[in-house]
């Protein structure tokens, strides 16, 4: 229901969970590629075994305390971390940027702000964010909104 007073809180929780999930998968991806560079002769079976081990380790470090479930290999499910390497962490940055922009746009004229932001041109992401929303790329807006949503 678009009129629900809980709508914004639920959207914040969804954004936070989505970010946490992709960050977990990204950590597995980075660790898998580090392992592959250290083990260039690894077989597909060894890669599968290591993926399950690393995914379970990342899960136990960051997700089990929140979810109350240990030893899940769920974060190893993204097979494209092997055939399209080292890009998953870019999703996390994109989600952080999206949330920052959404927060910045609240209470402003959407059309005017979008025109202003788009007219900034081609800049490095950090410089563009400073010009677009007035701050560096940061998870702080999401963390503040999450803290508020959990109250």
What do the predicted segments below correspond to?
Residues 26, 30-151:
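C-terminal, non-catalytic "cap/extension" segments appended to globular domains
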């Amino acid at each position: 229901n678009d009129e629900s007073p809980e709508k914004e809180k639920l959207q914040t929780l969804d954004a936070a969970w989505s970010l946490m999930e992709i960050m977990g998968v990204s950590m597995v991806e980075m660790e898998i590629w580090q392992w592959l560079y250290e083990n260039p002769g690894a077989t597909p079976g060894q890669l599968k075994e290591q993926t399950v081990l690393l995914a379970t380790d990342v899960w136990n470090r960051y997700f089990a305390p929140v979810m109350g479930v240990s030893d899940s290999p769920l974060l190893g499910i993204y097979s494209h971390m092997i055939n399209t390497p080292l890009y998953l962490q870019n999703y996390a940055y994109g989600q952080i940027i999206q949330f920052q922009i959404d927060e910045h746009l609240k209470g402003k004229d959407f059309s005017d702000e979008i025109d202003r932001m788009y007219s900034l041109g081609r800049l490095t992401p950090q410089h563009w964010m400073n010009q677009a929303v007035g701050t560096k790329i940061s998870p702080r807006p999401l963390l503040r909104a999450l803290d508020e949503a959990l109250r």
